[in-house]
């Protein structure tokens, strides 16, 4: 995994720089997400591994309908370098670079039960205040948390789950 990230990093940075220069973060992000989604399909991955598949055919297979010429050239470079399987990593890194440039923190809130709109808004306000940035929140439900929630915002993890509190209590009692 770390080797894939290392190999993907320069391509993600190049895509980001191009998107920044074009003022087209959203279209590039959407195109990369589409291409990454297509590239991970097992049938497409098998096609991409076939040495008889030409560069132009690979680009046509992975490029969204509404892509620009620059994006096609980017995919062609990936195809020539045999880096098309790295599209999921490139897409993820691109989105991280975009979030940083746009001063947005991406957070995942995993709760024991579905959050109400009011609870989600309160979490967004608290995270916005803590990070002093806009917050893009995705939610997930994990009943094993018993109660509460776990917030994962980049390098920061806030475990307010009952499961986490019980684990910390068990550790404290064991010591």
Swiss-Prot record:
Protein's cellular compartments: Cell membrane
Species whose genome carries this gene: Stenotrophomonas maltophilia (strain K279a)
UniProt-listed Pfam families: OSCP
First-listed, main subcellular location of the protein, grouped into a coarse class: membrane
Keywords from the named record: ATP synthesis, Cell membrane, CF(1), Hydrogen ion transport, Ion transport, Membrane, Transport
Matches recorded under InterPro entries: ATP_synth_OSCP/delta_N_sf (IPR026015), ATPase_OSCP/dsu (IPR000711)
Record text on subunit structure and interactions: F-type ATPases have 2 components, F(1) - the catalytic core - and F(0) - the membrane proton channel. F(1) has five subunits: alpha(3), beta(3), gamma(1), delta(1), epsilon(1). F(0) has three main subunits: a(1), b(2) and c(10-14). The alpha and beta chains form an alternating ring which encloses part of the gamma chain. F(1) is attached to F(0) by a central stalk formed by the gamma and epsilon chains, while a peripheral stalk is formed by the delta and b chains.
Lineage: Bacteria, Pseudomonadati, Pseudomonadota, Gammaproteobacteria, Lysobacterales
Gene designation per UniProt: atpH
Known role: F(1)F(0) ATP synthase produces ATP from ADP in the presence of a proton or sodium gradient. F-type ATPases consist of two structural domains, F(1) containing the extramembraneous catalytic core and F(0) containing the membrane proton channel, linked together by a central stalk and a peripheral stalk. During catalysis, ATP synthesis in the catalytic domain of F(1) is coupled via a rotary mechanism of the central stalk subunits to proton translocation.
N-terminal signal peptide: none
Topology in the lipid bilayer: Peripheral membrane protein
Family: Belongs to the ATPase delta chain family.
Gene3D superfamilies: N-terminal domain of the delta subunit of the F1F0-ATP synthase (1.10.520.20)
HAMAP family the record matches: ATP_synth_delta_bact
An annotated Gene Ontology molecular function: proton-transporting ATP synthase activity, rotational mechanism
Name of the protein in question: ATP synthase subunit delta
A GO CC annotation given for this chain: plasma membrane
């Amino acid at each position: 995994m770390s080797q894939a990230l290392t190999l993907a990093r320069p391509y993600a940075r190049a895509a980001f720089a191009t998107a920044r220069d074009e003022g087209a973060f959203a279209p590039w992000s959407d195109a990369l997400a589409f291409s990454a989604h297509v590239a991970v399909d097992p049938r497409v991955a098998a096609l991409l591994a076939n040495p008889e598949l030409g560069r132009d055919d690979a680009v046509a297979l992975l490029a969204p309908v509404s892509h620009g010429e620059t994006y096609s050239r980017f995919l062609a470079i990936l195809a020539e370098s045999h880096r098309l399987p790295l599209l999921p990593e490139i897409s993820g890194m691109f989105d991280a670079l975009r979030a940083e440039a746009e001063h947005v923190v991406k957070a995942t809130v995993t709760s024991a039960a579905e959050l109400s709109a009011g609870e989600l808004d309160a979490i967004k306000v608290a995270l916005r205040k803590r990070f002093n940035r806009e917050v893009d929140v995705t939610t997930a439900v994990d009943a094993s948390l018993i109660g509460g929630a776990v917030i994962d915002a980049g390098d920061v993890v806030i475990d307010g789950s009952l499961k986490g509190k019980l684990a910390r209590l068990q550790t404290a009692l064991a010591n």
